[in-house]
Design a protein with these regions (language model features):
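Active-site-adjacent structural segments surrounding the nucleophilic cysteine of cysteine proteases
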Residues: 1-86, 131, 138-139
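A local structural micro-motif
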Residues: 42, 101-102, 126
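Short helix-loop-beta junction
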Residues: 92-99
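Short, well-structured beta-strand/strand-turn elements
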Residues: 99-109
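Active-site-adjacent substructure of cysteine-protease-like catalytic cores
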Residues: 107-140
Length: 140
């Protein structure tokens, strides 16, 4: 029927991050995607072997963190960590899959565009969002 929306359900293996990886949503989502592609890897293996991580530093009573575009800030095992952005995960994925697949950073693409280009075609995506899909807080 015209105007009817189709539903696409992609059978991606679920991994619960809540107990072991409180700030590891990027890592857990990446491993879920890799398992969907048939690559047998654990979340711990991904974090320890492939994820670029850097700790926070304290200087003169101030805490400084690394660039989240280059590193996971802190540790996915620590509930006080910050996380990372798409370039860090893209680089980790490229180390694992090599030339077998193409990894594309689609930062800035709308949800509808991601659905049409990937999910409707049966390909899962790794999606960055704020808790409860609220708008991000931007600092200048």
């Amino acid at each position: 029927m015209p105007g009817e929306q189709k539903k696409v359900c992609i059978d991606v293996p679920y991994i619960d991050q809540s107990k072991l990886y409180p700030t590891g949503c990027e890592s857990v989502s990446t491993v879920m995607l890799l398992r969907f592609l048939g690559i047998d890897i654990t979340v711990d293996e991904f974090i320890e072997k492939y994820l670029e991580k850097k700790s926070f530093e304290e200087r003169d009573g101030q805490v400084y963190g690394p660039d989240p575009h280059r590193y996971f800030c802190g540790s996915p095992y620590d509930d006080e960590s910050f996380g990372c952005y798409a370039p860090v995960i893209r680089e980790a994925l490229e180390k694992i899959i090599g030339a077998e697949y193409t990894v594309t950073d689609e930062t800035g693409m709308t949800t509808d565009e991601l659905v049409e280009k990937y999910i409707d075609q049966g390909m899962p995506v790794i999606y960055w969002a704020c808790i409860n899909m609220r708008d991000p807080i931007l600092y200048r």
